[in-house]
Each structure stands twice: as C-alpha cells, then as structure tokens.
Regions:
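Structural boundary/hinge residues at secondary-structure and domain interfaces
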Residues: 31-145, 149-151, 194-236, 269-297, ...
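A conserved glycine-rich beta-strand in the N-terminal activation segment of trypsin-fold
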Residues: 152-218
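A short, solvent-exposed beta-edge/loop patch
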Residues: 50, 149-180, 251, 299-318
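Helix-loop elements that line ligand-binding/catalytic pockets
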Residues: 236-263
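A short-motif feature that recognizes glycine-rich, charge-decorated loops
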Residues: 248, 260-277
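N-terminal secretory signal peptides that target proteins for export/translocation
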Residues: 1-13
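Bacterial N-terminal signal peptides
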Residues: 14-26
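C-terminal regions of proteins
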Residues: 239, 245, 252, 289-302
Length: 326
C-alpha cells in the first residue's frame, strides 16, 4: 500500500472512531485504570458497580456466549449506539466500569467509564460538521446519541485523552461534579473500597451491590429464583452488601458473597437457604430447567458474617444466572 493510500485509510478509520466515541483501544492499559477512574469519578450515592475486563474475556473459548450476555447486558443502549455507527464494541472495548444509583441492576440508568486512546478534537470536528447535538457542562463537551432531548438518552464525554465517561445526562453531570470537587466521590465510602479490594484482580468480571440493591439481588438466590409465601424482609435487612465474581473455563463459575452485619444474621440466612432448598418452590424454580438445576446444586457455607454461595454451569446457562440475580 502506498503512503498516500495508507494515510487516507487512517483518516477514514479515525473518522469512524470519532462517530463512535473513538473507543479505539491501543491495548490493555492496566486492569486498575478503569476501576480507579470509576471509584474516583462516580457519585457517592452509587449503590452498585460492575467491572468487566473484555480483553481478558475475549481470550476465553466461551467468548461467543459471553458476548451475547455480558457485553450486551452491560452496555445496552450504549453498544447500540456504537454499532449504529459501525463500531464493534466487543472488539474495541477492553475495560468498562459501570455504576448504578438505583436499587435494581436490571433497570435502566447505568453509567460508566472506559479507558482508551481518544482523539477528542476530531470528535468535536465531526459533531460540528454533522450538526449532531453537543452540550457544554463544567468545561466539558457532552456528545449526544440521538436528538439529545430524550432524558434516558446516552451522552458521552472525554475526561482526558485516555478516559471517556458515558450515561444519562444527569448521571454524566454528576460524574463531572465529582471530578470538579463539588460533590463527593464513591471512593469516600470506606466499606465499599474494602469490598472492592477483595475483588480487584481476582476475576475478569465482578460486581458489588450495597443497600437495598444488595437485598434485591440476594433474595431470588435465597428463594430459588421464584417468589414464595415467606416474608424475607427480616432476613434481608442485615445484608450490607453482595459481592460477586464470575470466572470462565469451558463454562462459568459464579461466587457470591453475602456480607451481613453479624455472624448471627449470616447464620439465619444460611438456615433459610437450607429450608428453601428442600422446599417445592426451590425445585420448581421459575427460571426453567437450567436455573432449577443450577440452584439445586448451589453450594453454600457460612464464614463468619458472610454467606458464601458457589454455582457453576455451561456458558448457555448464563441467562439463568442473570435472571436469578435480577
């Protein structure tokens, strides 16, 4: 290829990246960068975080199944935006740190940060030429996906030349407020930082849920994936957090750690789980045969104030895990 053709090709490639937030990662930039950025940028009222190392996941033989569930579930509307402009998120995204300020991970409203190599000036030029919506806030340009008028629409911005942030407008502004020092960051939460330290570097996928979100996620696992007549409110109140991690090797293994206030409350949850496992509601799980088998073979033990849960299965059973966890 001649030098002129090569230069024209590079210009075209960069233009495509500009439309798609220029998520043209030059390689893995360190597993801690997205995590550090998320903890120092997310607002303090964030109740849930989820981390995925897509560069590591892509090396798994299970990746064809993983990408259908993990990537699409976590990026949702944002990945639709990327695909609509010809960017392949499963190839070009290496790390993402997501956050939620609500109580359910299945609901809308996730925001996040992604590390990469960006060309902000080229993106601004493209949006100016195409007259796509751009807002200004705290000295940053917020680029809109779509008309920019939808309150649930996705916006993105460049925090620096190697870090992008995205989410709904109010969440993205909250991230900028944190970075400008006018609001507290998530890393001021010492308990959550302690939980994060347990998970960092041990798995390509992990997450933390706190507050009511923790109980909302723990309840379906404890109840066998189906609503039952037992009032679980008293059992769920002592739950401080739910930590989870997922590993892949010819299938998946998920480990869930339910952190309780006291060893006594963890013992109560353990007893409840054993009772429900032998009840018809557990074996008749509403998630289908896959989830019923998965939950029936769930391994559990108490470790002080923690209830530790382990389950494993083939890659195509991941849907059931996600449904049970929602």
């Amino acid at each position: 290829m001649s030098d002129s053709k090569a230069k024209r090709s590079m210009v075209l490639i960069r233009a495509v990246w500009a439309v798609g937030i220029v998520l043209s990662f030059a390689g893995l930039l360190g597993a801690q960068e997205a995590i550090r950025a998320g903890l120092s940028s997310f607002p303090a009222d964030t109740q849930q975080v989820a981390y995925s190392n897509f560069a590591q996941l892509r090396s798994s033989s299970d990746y064809p199944q993983i990408r259908q569930h993990v990537l699409y579930q976590q990026l949702r509307g944002f990945q639709e935006f990327l695909r609509s402009v010809g960017v392949d998120p499963e190839r070009d995204i290496n790390e993402v740190m997501l956050g939620w300020r609500g109580e359910s991970p299945s609901g809308p409203g996730s925001f996040g940060v992604a590390t990469g190599t960006f060309d902000p000036d080229r993106v601004r030029q493209f949006f100016t030429q195409t007259q796509l919506p751009v807002q200004s806030y705290a000295g940053f340009d917020l680029f809109a996906f779509g008309s920019g008028a939808d309150p649930a629409g996705t916006f993105f911005t460049f925090l620096d030349s190697s870090l992008a942030a995205f989410g709904q407008l109010h969440d993205l502004k909250a991230i900028l407020d944190v970075r400008e020092g006018s609001a507290q960051a998530l890393d001021t939460n010492q308990k959550l930082r302690g939980f994060e330290a347990e998970l960092e570097g041990v798995s390509p996928q992990w997450g933390i849920l706190t507050g009511k979100a923790a109980g909302n996620v723990a309840a379906p696992w404890l109840a066998g994936g189906k609503k039952n007549t037992i009032d679980m409110t008293a059992f769920l109140q002592p739950i401080q957090a739910v930590l989870y991690r997922v590993d892949w090797d010819g299938g998946f293994t998920v480990h869930i750690s339910v952190a309780c206030v006291t060893p006594e409350s963890a013992a109560g949850l353990f007893q409840l789980l054993n009772i429900l496992k032998s009840a018809p509601v557990f074996s008749a799980s509403g998630g289908g045969p896959g989830s019923a088998s998965l939950l029936q073979n769930l391994e559990a033990h108490q470790n002080g104030s923690r209830l530790e849960l382990d389950a494993s299965g083939p890659a195509d059973a991941l849907d059931q895990v996600l449904k049970v966890g929602e």
